[in-house]
Amino acid sequence: MHIESPIKRRQSTRIYVGNVPIGDGAPIAVQSMTNTLTTDVAATVAQINALQKVGADIVRVSVPTMDAAEAFKLIKQQVSVPLVADIHFDYRIALKVAEYGVDCLRINPGNIGNEQRIRSVVDCARDNNIPIRIGVNGGSLEKDIQAKYKEPTAEALLESAMRHVDILDRMNFDQFKVSVKASDVFLAVDSYRLLAKQIVQPLHLGITEAGGARAGSVKSAVGLGLLLSEGIGDTLRISLAADPIEEIKVGFDILKSLRIRSRGINFIACPTCSRQEFDVIATVNELEQRLEDLITPMDVSLIGCVVNGPGEAEVSHMGIAGSYRKSAFYEDGIRQKERFDNDNIVDKLEARIRAKAAMLSKENQIDINQID
């Protein structure tokens, strides 16, 4: 059942990336980044649409050349999810994609150039009502900051960020968010904690270059979990050396585990032992695949025996407590007369979950429409 998160979020200003609100209490936005060649318009559009299908609120696209900028124009015309253009080295690319309707510009202080170039980007962003992300990265700090600190430190990342925040402040430009990413969990966490005390703008969270699907997910969950539990963060990206689809799934799983934002089914499943009366692992894996299209938040417990099965089912939207041959079925915490054959749990439970999700979605829509 739904339990409110005890987390009190950091107060920040509000910006919009396309039609997606960021900060000031808005839902924490989950984003990913394409890994196709941007000049391959068809492949990039296909990947963006696939990311949107699994819940991406925002998608970032690398724009390394003017040819990529021209491709970005065509891409933007074919997708509906807000796009962030990732700009490094050549500030003129930012000016070009601004003409093509980009929803946000990500610039890297470590390589975008001098203050005059930054001012050109800011002026263009203001004229076109485009927000900016100041994206600091521990692996690409400015040379003078590298020389000063010798190695990436939280203070070094903070100095880089504040240097560019100050430029935007002097230009009276407040439509921006900031990130201070590092591949080390403690370095990233310390950097964000320092930054959160210095500015009121929204913060984009991430553990950069976190690694492969398994290790990177764990590293991201630890780092972002610490920050989110402290109320820090307004948007996030999980950086994995894996299919970008996994980044969105992991991002929502982290938010779901902290009760911050839910999307789809939250499966509560036991790790199994010799007491299990049905194949829990196979059941969970099959249901996760079959039901990944659902977006209605629901808790479903799948426990293989009667030790913890009834207790978990009583606090879930639906639950199975394993029993000999036929397992007990619960809905809204109440044990039902119907029992599920242990060899046919997946099919029957899928049908019940889909029906329940449709009902909850309809009820939620009615509640929204009744709000003045």
Swiss-Prot record:
It is an enzyme of class 1 (oxidoreductase). The keyword Metal-binding applies. Converts 2C-methyl-D-erythritol 2,4-cyclodiphosphate (ME-2,4cPP) into 1-hydroxy-2-methyl-2-(E)-butenyl 4-diphosphate. Its cofactor is [4Fe-4S] cluster. Its EC number is 1.17.7.3. Disulfide bonds: none annotated. Pathway: Isoprenoid biosynthesis; isopentenyl diphosphate biosynthesis via DXP pathway; isopentenyl diphosphate from 1-deoxy-D-xylulose 5-phosphate: step 5/6. HAMAP family: IspG. [4Fe-4S] cluster binds at C270, C273, C305, E312. Belongs to the IspG family. Pfam families: GcpE. Keywords: 4Fe-4S, Iron, Iron-sulfur, Isoprene biosynthesis, Metal-binding, Oxidoreductase. This is 4-hydroxy-3-methylbut-2-en-1-yl diphosphate synthase (flavodoxin). Binds 1 [4Fe-4S] cluster. It comes from the Bacteria. One of its GO terms (molecular function) is 4-hydroxy-3-methylbut-2-enyl-diphosphate synthase activity (flavodoxin). It catalyses: (2E)-4-hydroxy-3-methylbut-2-enyl diphosphate + oxidized [flavodoxin] + H2O + 2 H(+) = 2-C-methyl-D-erythritol 2,4-cyclic diphosphate + reduced [flavodoxin]. The lineage of its organism: Bacteria, Pseudomonadati, Pseudomonadota, Gammaproteobacteria, Vibrionales. One of its GO terms (biological process) is isopentenyl diphosphate biosynthetic process, methylerythritol 4-phosphate pathway.
